[in-house]
Amino acid sequence: MREVAIVSFAQAKAKRRELDANEVEILMPVVQEAVARSGIPKREIGFTVSGSCDYVAGQPFAFVSALDAVGAWPPISESHVEMDGAFALYEAWVKLQTGEVDSALVYSFGKTSMGDPAAVLNLQLDPYTVAPLGIDAVSLAAPSLIGQQSCLRSGDA
């Protein structure tokens, strides 16, 4: 196995609601900072992979516009996982292990304030039996929480 190291990290300031900037405007300075800190010239990054959840953004193919923050010109080797940054990191690690590339840029993002999370997250449910009920996240969690409380009270936990 090849040794792999994370040589740089950058993160946008976490905000409860961001109304003044879109995902590209949030990502661009973060990606630029991470690349600059790495000391690896951008043209030498062999692979770029992102992780995000289009459901959370409330729009299909949200990751495509995020490529503007990376700067996909000249053409780059790029991939996207519809999951969090840990899965994107894993994909980059696999690519590095194959020896196909020597460096990778991994980033993940999510901006729930683009849509109403209560309405958007419902779209991830089974489209035939559960989603039509219009169950919000709190109501969906209630049976599980009631079961957990019951287990704790019984002393079986």
Question: Which residues are covered by each model-predicted region?
Answer:
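A short, glycine-/small-residue-rich helix N-cap motif at loop->alpha-helix starts
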Residues: D84-G85
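Conserved "HGTGT" condensation-loop signature of ketosynthase/thiolase-family condensing enzymes
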Residues: M1-S77, W93, Q97-T98, S108-A157
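Flexible, low-hydrophobicity surface segments
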Residues: V101-A104
